[in-house]
């Protein structure tokens, strides 16, 4: 809630810049939102990055924003991003997410925020993709079959990934892991370490 300034009385996110020469705080962008503080804090903790072109990239309310700090403007780069499907590198200069709408629905889109270049990762028919995280600047993602998405009698859904890949922005596969007859579950990606469990399918669960 804005309690002063040009947007007093409105709810939104404001980007300020401190001008050391003038010793004043300047408003650079105002993005109206209705999201609660708790969700806003969670989303901004996922991504907040400024590149050398003085462009700020933020994720909140399921949208990826680019704020032009010098131009006092903003634009939405992607809409409908689910929080759990969005991953960013440790220093936030790369990010990837599962596309949820349009012709590329189900694919993964990755972006380099310094160059603003993007790439799209596709899968074969009957397969599904899942973002897992980053090892340095390399994307970690999983490939699973649609038939390996299980729902038990209580309505709980579980997924078993068949192949886990580490891939750089140019599409070069750095490492790939697969075990016949077993499924990769409970994946945790740290800065330099990937942990997961190998599970067997048992009825409608793993």
Identify the role of each PLM range.
Residues 81-144:
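Long amphipathic alpha-helical scaffold regions
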Residues 33-49, 79-91, 125-137, 178-191:
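Repeated scaffold domains used in trafficking and secretory/extracellular systems
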Residues 1-16, 45-60, 92-102, 132-152, ...:
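Short beta-strand elements that form the blades of beta-propeller/WD-repeat-like
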Residues 6-39, 59-79, 103-125, 151-181, ...:
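Surface-exposed loop/turn elements that mediate protein-protein interactions on large endomembrane-trafficking
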